[in-house]
Structures are given as structure tokens and as C-alpha cells.
Amino acid sequence: MPSTSLPYTQMAFHMPLKELQPVDTSLPEHIIKGAVVIDKELTTWNRRAVIPSTALHTVFITINRLEQKQADVVKMAAREMNLPEDNTYGLMADAPKRFITNENIDQLGSGFILTLCASPDNYVKRITEILEDGKNIAQMENAVKTLDEFSLDPALIEAFYRCSSLELLFDLVRDDRVSMSYTLLSTCLRALSSILELAVGDVTWKSVPRDVVVSIAALVTGKAKREEVNTLLAALAMIEQLVIGDDTTRDWVLEEVPIETLIRHVEKSDERIALAALSLMNSMIRHCSDKDKRLELIESLEVVPFRNAVHSSLLRDGSARDPKALEQLVEVQRSLISAYDTSPASDSEIQKVLDIDSANENSEEDVEIWRTKLAEHRCGRLATVAMVLFGEKSPQDLRMLISENTMRIEGGKWQLIPMWMRCCDITAELFGLLPGRDELDRLISIIFSTDSPFPAVFSCIVHLFHRTWREMQAKGGEMDKVASFVLEQLRHVLKRKEIHDVEEMSADLETFSYKAMQEVRREEQLEKENDQLHSEAVISLKAKLRPKIEELVRINHLNYLKKGDVFRKPMKSKSLAKAAYWFWKLDASEKMLTITACDGERFVDDGHRDDIRQVWLKDVADVTNNDEIDRKASSSRFASSPSTNMLRGVRVQLKPTNDLKEGEVLMALTPDETQAGIWQESLAYLVGNTEMRSKTNAIVERMLKMELRVRLLNVKLADPENEPDVPPIPDDLISFISSF
């Protein structure tokens, strides 16, 4: 009997398919694989270590981070490399350079490359031997360099405190021989600074002894025999940390480093040194708790050499403005401004100001009001001094201002003393003396260019105020309005470009008129509105409003077609025959187009016309445009000049009939592009062609913008330049919360 079994291949083909499940071959998270290499300098830092000839210089190992500690991994690596296990080894990672410990072994990931090296204790012992010997400068430089490389590694620093002492580095700073080697000294200072900043154990900046502070201070005050850039940078940075770190070390620094000795570093060609010196100045002033000492430090910077040093290095013409330097200069200037005398003005100082305006016929009541306001002015003596200086140094300008003011009609004049006080308020706000947004970062070059910056800027503002008052045609009660506009003008001029001195500022203000500022306002308002229109909320609102606006425009256009328009018929030849016209009108049912011949540009419906044609829109195949040139010289509205004129055409293609296989074409011409566009797009919409709607879309977009801008008029948006007012925390916070 023949076998009925199928061949194997056919059986396999007809067997049901079995889905294979994916197999995860990745290692668990706590299992990592990587490589270990032998450090080439292993025997340098551990002289007892021996690398046998059978040692493997690179091995691959697997670490179980849950079960294995650092010591276990070191032993495993040494065993895999055929190294003697009686030596003490360590594992080192690069970028950043650090020793592997039980605390950071969890940070390793698969693919690591570690270096089997000497242990941290061996490193410290060898460094200590070299530094204590002190004979080979090259070896000392290499030892300190290694310490600097590991100065941010707690493992080596702990070993350093365990096997050596920080006094070893302090001795290097004290040693005059070390100061002759710039590389050794600068590296030592950097390493010492990093170790103190790391603050392992109780060793911090307050651990620095006074004689070391004196030695470091000598490097920046000019007492050192020689100066080098890297050493100077390291010393300046260390002194600043000593100022910040502890009250005792701060007092030592203030005694050993007079702030005026730092001025010479500001004019260095290396801007890093100038920046470090400025940063140290600011820290000395900022952290000085003694008010008298702080005022003394500030007054030491109110000198011409300091201003010249800043101008020659950090504010020189043509140099790029470093943001970090600008930040330091602004802080210096804030300190200088804080020392301005804003105490209440004396009676004699107030009388000097009033005497300047004594030539004008002012009532005794006004004079007494001004006297009181000057005595209570927030800028005090600073304001009265600026006013008196304006009268004494610019008497001709003052006479000119008063003369122009007296020629104005009654009610359109400003009063000198109130105007001066308002200009002082503006100047004080720009300088940060009064609440508001200061402009010190933009005024910095101007302030450092003059001995008396406040009176100089005040003088510019007085002239600007007078000119703006005239251009605005302001009246007596509009002092605040003009002042607000003047402040806005100043901010815009300062923002527009970098100004170097008072003369340049005055010239720029002369060219920036009231009308120019109005134009800027309009541009900013338009830009603000455009930004609002592109926000997500407005875009969402725009999408919701669009269908209603489109429907409104469509109905409006159809109503326009129902009123009807006169069009010119296309000319069959280029002869000078009289132009022919016809009147097109959409039926109220929006299903039929009525075309009536007419004699001229105006259509009069007398009700007795026989030449009326009715075209059903269902018989229209397509509506397109077809422009042509009008070469007729006519005085009608279709040709206002003898020159050629472009006529916009509305081309209506009817469906084919038995008589006309291609369908009849009706053409209507007009010089009015808007009229042609409305007819063409509206008829196209009625016959089912919704693609050609450029004119309609433009009108829809314009109406949408108008609608959105009207809606945004009453929406108050937060000003990004002004911080919102945050109310204080209530005294009884629990009852405040429970009330809700």
C-alpha cells in the first residue's frame, strides 16, 4: 500500500506559524562592562610597585555595582592584569580626573575606561616628599601640577589631610624662592584655592593664616618683586574669596590691600586682570560691614585715575563690550552713586536756587510752595547742587530757555523751579536713585566720562524738556505728561546705540524730535499688536472668527452683485468705433445673471427694454479673468488720459450647446481692479469654483485684523520690563489660608 505521508518540506509549509518572542540580551542595570589600563606613571607615584613582564596592560572586566565595592574592583583588575596583589592600587577616571571610591562607583556606566594607578595615599606621600625636599624646581612644579589636577577630588584631598598637611602649601606661598618660579607659584595658588573652595572637613578659607594672607596680598599691591599674569589672576581670585569667606580674613585683606592699589590693574591690557580687579573691588565694598570704612572705600574710587583706567581699558572706542565687565562696572557705579549726598538741602542752598528764578515775577505763595518742595525733595542736596551748577555754568543757556518761555502765550509756559525738580526726578530714576527702571548699563560710558555725571545728565534733560514742551505745545498743567514723554525719549535714545560722552548724548537728543518719538511709538505699538496677533490664544480666536467673517464678506459681495455694474464690451477690432457697454446684475435668487445693453457709462432702468438677456448660473461652466489693454483715447471714467489703460476682464464661459460646441463666452471689462475681482470671485463661488479667492481672502484677513485689534484694546498684558507687584506675606498666615 503506498505511503500517504507528505514530504517534510510540504509538512513544514502547511504547519501553523509560531510567533517567536523577542529575547532581551541587555545586561541588568547594576552590571556594567568596561576596560582597565595600567597607568604609565604607576611606578613614579609608588616606587615600591613592580610591573612584571607578564602583566597585561589592558583588560576587560565586569562590575556588579550591587555587590562589589571599590576595593573588590581594584583587586579583580590587578588579578586580571597579573599584577602583584600586595601593592596598594587605585582606580582613576578621566574627565573630570578623579579617583574611584565607594561613593562614586555608582556613577560609572557600561563602556567605561579606567586607569589602574597608585592609590591616593601613595600620590600624597610622593608629592609631600618632593615638596619637603625642595631642591628640584621641575619636580616641585610637576608635583603641584598633579595636586592641582586632583584639587577638586575629595578622595585625594582627604588623603592629603590624612598623610600630609595644608601647611605644606602655605610654606610654599611664604617661600621667597618659590615666588621666583611663576609656574610653581601660580599653580600652587590655584591648587590651594581649589582645595579651600572644596571645603573637605573643617578646612575652609578661614583656615588661612594671616602671614599667608600678607604674602598673597603682596602679589597684587605691588610689593612683590615681579608680577606675572597667571600669578596675578590667581592671587586676585584668592583675595576675593578671602573677602567673601570670613570676617577675620576680610579685615586682614582690607588692612593689607588698599583699594586704590587695585586701580592700576584695571588699565592692564589683559582684560582678565581688569575684570578680576573690578570684581575684587566690588566684593570689598559689598561685604564691608563698617559704614565708615565702606564710604572710605567708595571715595577712594571717586578719582580721575580710576575713571581714566576704566576708559582706557574696558570702555575704549572700538572695543567690544564684555557683558561681564559691564556688569562689574555697573556695580561699581551703583556703589559710587550710593555715596551721593541726598541729605535734605540747607536753607541757604534752597535760597540760591530760588534766587536764580528771582527775575521772574513769581507770587510769594508759589515761592513758598517751591521752598517746601525743595526741602522735601527725595534727592536733597544732590538736586539743589545740580540746579545751581546749571545756573552758574550755563547762564547763557538759562537766559535763552527763559526768553523762549516768556514769548509763549499765557497758560503755555513752564515754571523754572517745578521744571527743574521734574528733570531731577527723571535723572535720579535713570541713575537708580528713585524707584523705576535705571539705565546705568547704557549710561556707563557717559558717567565714567565726566567728573560730575549727575549735573551733566541733568543739564541735557533740561534742554530736552524745554524742546519737547515746545514741540508738544504743552500747557501749564501738563508737566507730568511732558516729563513722561521726555523719559521715554531718553530711554529710546540710550537704547538705540552706544553713547560715549555727554556731548554725544546731547547731540543725539537734538536730532530726536517729538515727531520722531511719535513715529517710534507708532512702530512699537504696531509691533506689539503684531506680536499679540501671532500668540496662540489670538490664533485660536482668529480660527473661530474666520467662518463668520467669511460669511459676512460673501454676503456683502453678493449684495454688491445684486446692485449691478456697468461694464464695457470687448472690442471686436482695433478700430475707433464707439465703445459699447452693458449692465450686469445678479438676480435676488442668486441663480440668474441679468445682462442689459446700455448706451453709456450710466445705466437707467426705464422698464421698457427689449435687449435683456438672462443667463442661468447652472449653465455657466467657469468664470476666469482675462485682461486686455484699452488703446482708445477717451475722456470717460474708463480712460482718464490719452495713454493706454489696462482693463480688467471678467470672462464667463457657458456650457456647450448644440449650436456652440465650445460654449459661448461673455466678457465684461472695467478699469477698476477691485470691481473686477469681486465679480469674478463671487460668480466663481456661485458656480462652485472656490479656489480663486485672493481678493476675498485679502478682505477677510483685513477685517479679521481689525476685529482682533478692537478686541485686544481692553486686554491688559504684562510688561516684561516691569516686575509684577508681589504683595507681602500676611502676618497671620494660618488664618489667611483658612479664610479661603
Curated annotation (Swiss-Prot):
Major place of residence: cytoplasm
Keywords, alphabetical: Apoptosis, Cytoplasm, Phagocytosis, SH3-binding
Highest taxon of the lineage: Eukaryota
GO cellular component: cytoplasm; plasma membrane
Cell compartment(s), UniProt: Cytoplasm
Alphabetical list of InterPro entries matching this protein: ARM-like, ARM-type_fold, ELMO_ARM, ELMO_dom, ELMO_domain-containing, PH_domain
Short sequence motif named SH3-binding, residue ranges: 724-727
GO MF annotations in UniProt: enzyme binding; proline-rich region binding; protein-containing complex binding; SH3 domain binding
Domain ELMO: 348-494
Any one biological process term the GO annotation gives: apoptotic process
Alphabetized SUPFAM superfamilies for the sequence: ARM repeat (SSF48371)
Gene3D superfamilies listed in its UniProt record: 6.10.10.90, Leucine-rich Repeat Variant
Pfam families: ELMO_ARM, PH_12
Annotated region described as Required for punctate localization, cell corpse engulfment and distal cell tip migration, given as residue ranges: 555-690
Signal peptide interval: none
Function of the protein: Involved in apoptosis and necrosis. Required for the cell corpse engulfment process. Has roles in the formation of actin halos and distal tip cell migration. Plays no role in amphid axon outgrowth.
Subunit relationships: Interacts with psr-1. Forms a ternary complex with ced-2 and ced-5.
Protein name: Cell death abnormality protein 12
Gene: ced-12
